[in-house]
């Protein structure tokens, strides 16, 4: 089945056309600077070089329209379309074939992720209008986490407030964490029972997964909560918001921008949110960059402890996403903190585990299997499309 996977961000849109049977990628690309008259469109086919051009992208409809226009020039067929949706709210515990009711629910929960859901909904609507005969499937970042017990997802706020505004922990990166479990289980079999999935990138989260069921995760009502990230602060004292507004005169929007776009690795390093840039400067002795990496590893380790406790133990740890897949030093710093749990990594395997598919990096005799598993959210989305539509 040939599935077009669409991943619409707040100001960007990525896509990939792949065959679910062979995993062959026929075409892929991206639209950048959506909302601008100086957008950038990139497209490549069959693993060839990406061709780019400047295109005005006033909104997400214009972006997906350009993608479909380009794909229509090829001989590739599209059998279904899968859409990554950041927030499914309280409505969805699985992916869903899009109809009018599903669209209404996506828009209903959009205030929980206003920078994403509205753009994603616009892309879906255009695809439904353009190809009414094709199935569209919404794959939610949050649905995997809907198995969390009430004690894990409930906030200690007045119940009437939480009920009225649907305030609770929803989590994110669910499609990636689901892939990590699937691959770890496929490789390790019965040895994989309690998994700590570490999605460490510009956005970062952990998930505690027991027998395929999410028990807890670090992101909360929004993806701002939890770990320190590229530009997000992660968990801080909530009163910090009130304090900055009261004493600093900051508006709500200024504080929101600060915590989402000006914090994390960028704020501590003072140079970049890109871990590669920070690692280079840290190796040269830059104290702020050294602190940024130490904080990133420390905060991930500290929250990992709570994830492990929620499962009453751990037998498998996986690392994925940009930092998790490519930065051996972060993996080592993280795992060294859990030597008391019997975690041991093989330093040579850890250093070499870059870009070669799933790899075990734990040492012989380690009580916990540690792996690097490159995530593939597009694969998961495409197979959800196949699973939900192929027999219809």
Regions from the language model: what does each represent?
Residues 3, 12-57:
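Short glycine-rich, Thr/Ser-proximal phosphate-binding strand/loop in the N-terminal lobe
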Residues 8-9, 84-88, 200-202, 314, ...:
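Glycine-rich beta-strand-to-loop/alpha-helix junction loops that act as flexible
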Residues 71-116, 137, 143-152:
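Short beta-strand-loop/turn "lid" adjacent to the catalytic site in phosphate-handling enzymes
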Residues 83, 114-118, 135-140, 146, ...:
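General beta-strand structural signal in soluble alpha/beta enzymes
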Residues 144-247:
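Glycine-rich phosphate-binding loop of actin/hexokinase-like ATP-binding domains
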Residues 210, 215-251, 257, 321-353:
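Catalytic phosphate/nucleotide-handling subdomain of diverse soluble enzymes
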Residues 257, 264-268, 275-310:
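Adenine-nucleotide phosphate-binding core of ATP-dependent small-molecule kinases
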Residues 290, 294-315, 324-392:
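Internal helix-turn-beta structural module
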